[in-house]
Structures are given as C-alpha cells and as structure tokens.
Amino acid sequence: MKHASSRAPDLLHGPVFSNMTRFFLPIMLGSLLQQLYSMVDAVVLGRLVGKSALAAVGGSDLAIINLVVGFFVGLASGACVVVSQHYGAGEDGAVRRAVHTAILFSVVIGAVMTALGIGLARPILVLLDPPADTLEDSIVYLQWYFAGMIPSMVYNMGAGILRAVGDSKRPLYFLIVCALANTALDLLFVAGFRLGTAGAAIATSLSQLICAGLVVWTLARIPGACRLQLSELRFDRALLGRMTAIGLPAGLASVMYSAANVIIQKAINLLGTDAAAAWSIFWKLDGIYWPVSNAIGITVMTFTGQNYGARQPERIRKIIRTGLGMHLGFSALFSLTLFLTRYLTVRCFTDDPAVIAEGVTIICMLAFFYPVFCCVEVFSSAMRGCGNSVMPTVLTLFGTCLLRLALLYTVTFPHLSNWTIAICYPATWGATSLLFLIYYRFFRWMPGQKPQT
C-alpha cells in the first residue's frame, strides 16, 4: 500500500538502517530549516536592532513558544501514530477518516491558541519578569507570532500525516521554500521597513502560511486514502478519542519540559540583560540539536507505528536498536562540534564582549552532556508508536520535571549563577534516561507483548 509516494522507503520490509536513514534525512534537514527561522530572526535582530531585541526573542518568548507549540506537536503525534498504524495494517477507510479528523482538529486548536496567545502575552511575560528593556519587544514579538498559529498548526499536522505514511521528502521541499521566504521577509521587514521585533515575527508567520498552503495543496491532490477533501472535514469521534489518548500525554510531557524551562528562564532573567542575551544565543545553538533529536524520534515512532499495525514486534526491536545508534552518534558529533566552534558561533550573534564571554562559558558547561539524552528520545518514541503514551509521560514527569523543579528551588535560586542553572539539564537528562532504560528492559512496554527477559 504505497499511496503517499512510490519512491518512499518501505517501513515494513527490507534493511532497517538504510530505510530509517532514507526516511530520517529529509526530516532532519526540514527540522533544521525550521530552526533556521528562529536563528535568522536572532541574527538579524541582534545585528540590526541590538542585544535587547535579541534577548527578547530568544529568552522568555522562546520559552513560551516552545511550551505552546510543543504541546500541539505532542498532541499531533497521536494523530500521526493512529494514521501510521492503520496505514501499516492496510485499512484505507480508517486512514481517510483519521486524516480529515486531524486536519480539522489542527484548525480548531490553532484558532484557540491564536486567541489565547494574543490576549495573554502581556500578563504571562510580566509574570516571568524579563529585563525591563526587553519587555515591550517580547510582547510585540509574541503577539505577532501567535497571530500565525493556525497555519503553523495546519502545516505541522499535514507534514506529520505525510511522514506517517512514509513520505518525508515533500515536507522538506516545502520548508526549503519557506526558509528562503523567511530570510527575505526578515530582511525586508527588519532592515527595510525598520519594524524591529514585530517585523521578525511577521516574517515567521507569513512563512508558516506558505508552508501550510503547500501542505494543504499537496494533500488535496495526493492519490489514495490520504487525499484531503473539504467535504469530508469532520470529526470521527472514535478516532479523535484515540488520537487524544495517545497525543495528550505526549503533549503534557512536552509542556512539563517547557514549564520547567520557563521557570529556568525566570532565574536567567534575574541575572540581567547580558546573561539573558548569552543564554538566548546558547538556546539558538542548542536549538540545532533538538530538531535532529526529534527527527530521530519521529523516524522511530513512524517505523514503530506501521510495524505495530502490521504486527511485527521483532522488527520493532531492531528499529529501537538502530535508533539508539543513530541518536548516540549524532549526539557525540554535535557535542564535539559545539565545543570546538564555541567562539566562532557566539560571535555570529553579537560583538558585545560581556555577552560573548558568558555565552562561551555556558557552552563549556553543557556541550558534552547531549549523549546522556539518547534513551529518553528513542524509547519514548517507540513506546508512543505502539500506542503506549502514558508511561513515557509519567517517567518524564518524575525524571525531568519534578527533579528539575527540585534542583531549581534547592540549588539554583538559593545560589543563583550560570553554573547552578546549567546543572539542571544533565542531571535530569541522566535520571530520565535511567528510568526509561529500566522500564524498557524489565516491564511490559509494548501493548500485547511480553516484557524483555
């Protein structure tokens, strides 16, 4: 059943590593292009407007955006799992109903996020207590960013559907177009029209609109069960319930990560504008890692979902082992590259000596800890691909969120410094990885299968 693309890798048969690599590479490149939106905003604002604008879009705003968008991406993963399982099982009717339910759901959620984001931007940012010279820029950027939530949600859901049926290339092509558009619009609105942070946010929202238009146009013309027709846009209550049951815990897990990071951002804000700008630069560089990590997770989840639908548990275990190898190799390479290029990369964002010094110090603190996170991404993605979304959320709650909060209030706030902020990350990654490893090794994580022995 190859409705999506006759050239797509076969997720159910053939060599696991080569097929996963073919599927993963376009997702990775697309994820990096999405991150490029944010990095272009930061470079343009840092160079043309100043460090206050850089701190505004990369600090509190980024923490809030990651929280909200992360929740939807987690929620959308439930739809992708349902589509991939029915696609793997060869159930065209269920795939068709799932696609239309998912797209309609993304429109509704996007509209709600737009209203809440625009209305609550100021009170939420005031609560986070950013440096006074960044507050108004932060509010303007966030409100304009949330104005583009509907196309952003539609694109992410539509691209997820294409990937769920094995087509990871077309979402990449769309993002190439949109990355070029975002760069051109950034220069037009910020350098040309002098709109500052508002111009950067408008450029990002318009780029997301282009992405959404391309993915809807593709789904409306794709042959087979995934074809989108306006007349069939309605909720299938049973499928929506399954999507929510799988996606809601994943969304909550993302919210828990982001909520803890919002509190960390509050601690960073207490250190002043230089520290806020330095951490903002680090987040932009660190932001290169997470899209690739997430791309490996999407690959593992999609392959697992289709093979779970096709009842191939042994192939699922091969997928997990391959995913761990891919993630560990990438993490080690990223850690080394980030450390070796620390001065060069930080100077791309600013010429301010104080900000450069703090940014380089932060990189030295955290660069070599990324491999610790591997088990979290791969095991949680495999479990969600099999429909087990609750336990990954529980493990994330205890290993990451509660422990991170405990460290914040017992170590970070009483002894506030860049070091006590940084230590929260590797400590909680390690704890959560250990919990996932124990659960995978000794418990029944795959519905309908026996635990490992």
Where are the language model's segments positioned?
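Interfacial/gating helices of multi-pass transporter permease domains
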Residues: L45-N66, D133-D137, T197-A198, L239-I246, ...
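Alpha-helical transmembrane segments of multipass membrane proteins
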Residues: M39-A42, A115, P123, M157-I161, ...
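Short alpha-helical transmembrane segments in multi-pass integral membrane proteins
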Residues: M1-F24, V83-G148, A184, G192-L248, ...
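Helix-terminus/linker motif at the lipid-water interface of multi-pass membrane proteins
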Residues: L32, L36-A55, L125-A132, L188-L195, ...
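Transmembrane helical elements of multi-pass membrane transporters/channels
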Residues: R22-D41, W144, Y155, C178, ...
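Small-residue-rich hydrophobic transmembrane alpha-helices
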Residues: L54-A115, S152-P171, A278-R342, F373-T396, ...
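Short runs within selected transmembrane alpha-helices of multi-pass transporters and secretion channels
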Residues: A76, C80, Y145-R163, P171-N182, ...
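Residue-level signal for short hydrophobic patches within transmembrane helices
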Residues: H13, F17-L36, V40, I64-F71, ...
